[in-house]
Amino acid sequence: MDHDERLRLAADLTERLLDRHGAAIVAVGVHGSVARGDDGQESDLDLAVVTTGPEAQVADRSLYLRDPGLVVDLGAIAADAYLEEAGHIGPAWPLAADQYVNHLAVHDPGGFFHKLRHVHEAAVEEAGPEVFAAAAGFDLVQLLSWDATARGAELAGDLLTAQAALKEAAVLAALVVGLHTRTPYRNLSHALHATAATGAAGPAFAEAYRRLLDPTAEPALQVLALGRARDALLTLADREGIPYQAPGLDAFV
């Protein structure tokens, strides 16, 4: 299925949704690779259905459409909730930001997606360094947890758990770097490749991160690579004031 065929499918689905729900739908837009125009033969169709509120009975759906053989991911969200999300810089921001700024409107009589983009861009512009640092610190703490899981699982010979932990840690490292550099990613693949090429966390990080992602590397070597990438990120955090540690229990009170 090509780009134009996906757009026709989106238009057909939007028409059906409007017939069913009418004025409860504020806007419908395509996001992801189709909205950016870089979709390929196997790309999914991602749709955001914006509603007037939680009372609108539009359900989230992620289904494989047998004909033409394509995954359609439909997410329904109230307009106010979507705008609130767009105005928040959180731990997932590098991967979440694309959907706020890259929408291809299929139905948008009130210009909702323009407003969504404006709200998000204003939030990014107005957010101080401490906002991005706090979000990066949250991800870094999660990375430390997965790093410990990966090391423990590898030592115990539990390679399945070790591999799962390594993958989670790789994504979290990309989020830390993306937040530190204020870099939004198009998708997960872009996040991993961009992080592997970055110099933002120093040359030691980039080399270790590439080894971490190497599918031909032994799990033990990947765990070691994760440790080196972790250390580079901790050095970065200490230098740049990214909060991730507490001197004592009073920090939790």
Where are the predicted features?
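Conserved NTP/Mg2+-binding pocket subregion across the NTase superfamily
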Residues: 66-157, 252-253
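Conserved nucleotidyltransferase catalytic core and NTase-mimicking acidic/glycine-rich helix/loop elements
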Residues: 124-253
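Metal-dependent nucleotidyltransferase catalytic core
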Residues: 1-24, 29-43, 48-99
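Conserved short hydrophobic patches within well-ordered secondary structure
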Residues: 25-29, 116, 173-176
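Intrinsic-disorder-associated interaction segments
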Residues: 3-6, 89, 105, 109-112, ...
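Short N-terminal helix-initiation segments at or just after the protein's N-terminus
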Residues: 9-18, 107-116, 246-251
